[in-house]
């Protein structure tokens, strides 16, 4: 375990993330430009695909970080039966949900019920599929729909804010089931689908297209929002949310719906819109 990961056990997660949020939204020219220049240089951010490629134009660091891409920079897989990768990033893990458990790293796993904050909500995903995608600071930070769906419910699960970098994934037990997260439940033509937005150290917020800022809340209770009857339907490939810094999204699918795309594995670099899985059509 690295020193940084070890320190995250004792660091004041909330305080650091609150400070990061204040800096991310600062409109002080020197502050926001220093942040933009530092992150661009350190992580090799490529602005050539951004709708606004001039880093000086962004009013805040957060505006830069959640930047839109040029039209056509990402396109959905041409196969209409392909479920799509929800974001740019790197596969942390993917595979079957075996006996209700989701694989994190060698010797590490957690239950779907722990992740979703609800035993009953996890039942439809037993023996289904999961994919965990890590968004690094250089990546496009908007999350899109793998498949068309109607929003049924969101569940804000309070928790810690450990780093979600590779070393933490290998060494922090049940990492994604311990960090603060927003669970988004959708109804689709094949049944339920869940997209879980996992917060992390220095992540200053998660926003959804239907409700704006969802995290931070910094509460200590699970909070549910019922969207049944609201008619919030998002099409395949549509934007659904964004991270106001880097983090992780986990997609859960029920059994018998799709087969994972061949060639995908842990550590694979992926792009929004490429095939994650393909429908199993009788």
From Swiss-Prot:
Top EC class for this record: lyase
Active-site residue numbers: 88 (charge relay system), 144 (charge relay system), 247 (charge relay system), 247 (schiff-base intermediate with substrate)
Membrane topology, record value: Peripheral membrane protein
UniProt keyword terms in alphabetical order: Cell membrane, Decarboxylase, Lipid biosynthesis, Lipid metabolism, Lyase, Membrane, Phospholipid biosynthesis, Phospholipid metabolism, Pyruvate, Zymogen
Entry EC number(s): 4.1.1.65
Residues at the site labelled Cleavage (non-hydrolytic): 246-247
Modifications made to the protein after synthesis: Is synthesized initially as an inactive proenzyme. Formation of the active enzyme involves a self-maturation process in which the active site pyruvoyl group is generated from an internal serine residue via an autocatalytic post-translational modification. Two non-identical subunits are generated from the proenzyme in this reaction, and the pyruvate is formed at the N-terminus of the alpha chain, which is derived from the carboxyl end of the proenzyme.
Matches recorded under Pfam families: PS_Dcarbxylase (PF02666)
InterPro entries: PS_Dcarbxylase (IPR003817), PSD-B (IPR033177), PSD_type1_pro (IPR033178)
GO cellular component terms listed in the entry, alphabetical order: plasma membrane
Highest taxon listed in the record's lineage: Bacteria
Reactions catalysed, as given in the entry: a 1,2-diacyl-sn-glycero-3-phospho-L-serine + H(+) = a 1,2-diacyl-sn-glycero-3-phosphoethanolamine + CO2
Localization: Cell membrane
Cofactor: pyruvate
Note accompanying the cofactor annotation: Binds 1 pyruvoyl group covalently per subunit.
Pathway membership: Phospholipid metabolism; phosphatidylethanolamine biosynthesis; phosphatidylethanolamine from CDP-diacylglycerol: step 2/2
Listed GO biological process terms: phosphatidylethanolamine biosynthetic process
Any GO molecular function: phosphatidylserine decarboxylase activity
Complex and partners: Heterodimer of a large membrane-associated beta subunit and a small pyruvoyl-containing alpha subunit.
Protein family membership: Belongs to the phosphatidylserine decarboxylase family. PSD-B subfamily. Prokaryotic type I sub-subfamily.
Function of the molecule: Catalyzes the formation of phosphatidylethanolamine (PtdEtn) from phosphatidylserine (PtdSer).
Protein name per the record: Phosphatidylserine decarboxylase proenzyme
Organism: Xanthomonas campestris pv. campestris (strain B100)
């Amino acid at each position: 375990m690295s020193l940084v990961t070890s320190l995250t056990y004792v660091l004041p997660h909330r305080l650091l993330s609150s400070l990061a949020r204040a800096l991310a939204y600062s409109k002080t020219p020197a502050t926001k430009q220093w942040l933009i220049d530092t992150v661009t240089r350190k992580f090799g951010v490529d602005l050539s695909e951004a709708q606004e490629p001039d880093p000086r134009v962004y009013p805040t660091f957060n505006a830069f970080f959640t930047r839109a891409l040029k039209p056509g920079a990402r396109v959905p897989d041409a196969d209409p039966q392909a479920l799509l990768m929800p974001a740019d990033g790197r596969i942390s893990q993917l595979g079957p949900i075996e006996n209700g458990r989701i694989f994190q790293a060698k010797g590490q796993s957690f239950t779907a019920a722990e992740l979703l904050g609800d035993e009953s909500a996890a039942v439809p995903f037993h023996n289904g599929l999961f994919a965990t995608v890590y968004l690094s600071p250089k990546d496009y930070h908007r999350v899109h729909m793998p498949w068309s769906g109607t929003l049924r419910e969101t569940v804000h699960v309070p928790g810690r804010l450990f780093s979600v970098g590779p070393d933490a994934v290998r060494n922090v037990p049940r990492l994604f089931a311990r960090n603060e997260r927003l669970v988004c439940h959708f109804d689709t033509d094949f049944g339920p689908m869940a997209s879980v937005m996992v917060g992390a150290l220095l992540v200053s917020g998660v926003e959804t297209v239907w409700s704006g800022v969802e995290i931070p809340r910094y509460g200590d209770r699970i909070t549910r929002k019922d969207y049944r009857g609201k008619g919030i339907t998002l099409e395949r490939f549509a934007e659904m949310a964004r991270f106001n810094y880097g983090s992780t999204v986990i997609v859960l699918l029920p059994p018998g719906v799709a087969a994972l795309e061949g060639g995908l594995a842990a550590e694979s670099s992926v792009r929004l819109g490429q095939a994650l899985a393909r429908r199993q059509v009788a």
